[in-house]
């Protein structure tokens, strides 16, 4: 099982394996960061377009799920539990990816989030205030999806991803 895990990590670009010598964690390049954020923007935009085109009741259901996740994020941050916050952040974005009604894009979105977490995990560090800024942006994103305001969503998403990238 360990060998298979290492092979998977190598295929995903996280490790470089050296037979009979060991493994090396592949450093994160500026190009990888750029490509992950660019791909996230494309996938997220597509999902938001699909959600904003849905009937009000369907959009409201997705927004309700997002609001519930935001409430959990607030609770986690009130307790300075950044580990829980990180998982809830992933859930928030996955709800949007799943709402795009394309399982391939939702899977790609999940993979991109995992790659992004590789370089953002240390960026938030122990900074609850920084995490609260992201939660405030989540509120704006959820509100834009609830009302079907794609322009507001995309503007906030651009700020959200730019702020995340600038933390690196």
Per-region residue spans from a language model:
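Short alpha-helical transmembrane interface motifs in multi-pass membrane proteins
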Residues: 29-30, 121-124
């Amino acid at each position: 099982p360990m060998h298979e895990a290492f092979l998977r990590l190598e295929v995903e670009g996280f490790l470089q394996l050296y037979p009979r010598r060991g493994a090396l964690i592949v450093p994160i390049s500026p190009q990888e960061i750029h490509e992950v954020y660019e791909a996230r923007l494309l996938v997220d935009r597509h999902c938001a377009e699909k959600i904003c085109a849905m009937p009000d009741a369907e959009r409201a259901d997705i927004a309700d799920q997002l609001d519930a996740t935001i409430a959990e994020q607030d609770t986690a941050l009130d307790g300075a539990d950044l580990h829980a916050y990180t998982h809830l952040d992933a859930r928030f974005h996955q709800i949007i990816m799943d709402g795009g009604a394309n399982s391939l894009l939702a899977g790609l979105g999940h993979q991109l989030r995992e790659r992004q977490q590789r370089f953002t995990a240390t960026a938030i560090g122990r900074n609850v205030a920084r995490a609260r800024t992201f939660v405030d942006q989540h509120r704006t994103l959820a509100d834009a999806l609830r009302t079907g305001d794609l322009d507001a969503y995309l503007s906030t998403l651009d700020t959200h991803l730019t702020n995340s990238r600038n933390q690196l």
